[in-house]
Curated annotation (Swiss-Prot):
Biased composition (Basic and acidic residues): 152-163
Region (Disordered): 77-185
Annotated pathway: Amino-acid degradation; L-lysine degradation via saccharopine pathway; glutaryl-CoA from L-lysine: step 6/6
Protein name: Dihydrolipoyllysine-residue succinyltransferase component of 2-oxoglutarate dehydrogenase complex
Lineage, uppermost ranks: Bacteria, Bacillati, Bacillota, Bacilli, Bacillales
SUPFAM superfamilies: CoA-dependent acyltransferases, Single hybrid motif
Function of the molecule: E2 component of the 2-oxoglutarate dehydrogenase (OGDH) complex which catalyzes the second step in the conversion of 2-oxoglutarate to succinyl-CoA and CO(2).
Pfam families associated with the record: 2-oxoacid_dh, Biotin_lipoyl, E3_binding
Amino acid sequence: MPEVKVPELAESITEGTIAEWLKNVGDSVEKGEAILELETDKVNVEVVSEEAGVLSEQLASEGDTVEVGQAIAIIGEGSGNASKENSNDNTPQQNEETNNKKEETTNNSVDKAEVNQANDDNQQRINATPSARRYARENGVNLAEVSPKTNDVVRKEDIDKKQQAPASTQTTQQASAKEEKKYNQYPTKPVIREKMSRRKKTAAKKLLEVSNNTAMLTTFNEVDMTNVMELRKRKKEQFMKDHDGTKLGFMSFFTKASVAALKKYPEVNAEIDGDDMITKQYYDIGVAVSTDDGLLVPFVRDCDKKNFAEIEAEIANLAVKAREKKLGLDDMVNGSFTITNGGIFGSMMSTPIINGNQAAILGMHSIITRPIAIDQDTIENRPMMYIALSYDHRIIDGKEAVGFLKTIKELIENPEDLLLES
């Protein structure tokens, strides 16, 4: 019978975690229809069946890590089950599963891979996956004696664990003692221990890699936002009318300013590959977006060829896709430079961490009204923003980093020039 395998995703992605089965065992499946959602290091993707038929077996459970090319489901022939009345068209195995299924097992918390089997000795109903039930029969194991690890559903690995139990009892007891000692280190203090999501674990790993593998340094400057705020105030209503409701924000100004600065200082648009330095001739700018799953960085492509309205519309679209978990892998890879805005959370100053293999990242911050010396005799309150450029000192010299940030400052403080250049 045809197998559904984890498809090739992106060059850097070799595995994923099954987030949710979208089809139950016995359900009809159309060609090209999604049967499960896979969580990868970057985005969630739907895995589709290349054949029409019936989902006859799930070879992995929700929460399992699966590799690219691994078989995760089997598609059998038939039209599937719409209800118990249609079960006469199923295979004998499917009829057995349907007849033994508990009526109350309908809520979403139950693993979609589970089926029910009556124990021949005591008629007790046992929840088990089809592969586990078959494996138990082949090895003469009584499912009633197997302790399931997850969701009260017996799986193949639970049977293996039972068979290996005598040899591993001492090791298990030692491990349990270590765990107990670790948990009881502060017995009177409340703690919560939980596993990190795949995406958070990946982010933690990559952030540490950047910190360990780059000569990261941060330089700062400050920007007087008076002129750009006045320009935005004058233009925003007409801008929305002219561009189908698209709002004029600060991100488009900083994006266009970054493109101009990258052209002036191409080292900032580079990366190291072994002994080579690759200078990118394109301007795909990453914009950090905060979601419930953490920070994601989709890329606005070809920012040098887009106007302010196109950039603002694309940023808004990517933000919606990120929060609705609809970003594709194409949205998340092969960027050249990143902008992050900690100001939306109230950050006054920070040292952002370089994104992936890029050479630098620009940090925006809160706009704060502060007294500024205009000249020797005049002090005025001005809306000021600190900006930061974290950069890889292996590629970028301090002179170029300071010059880059100074270019950003000059363009934002003279936004009319930025508009003309666009």
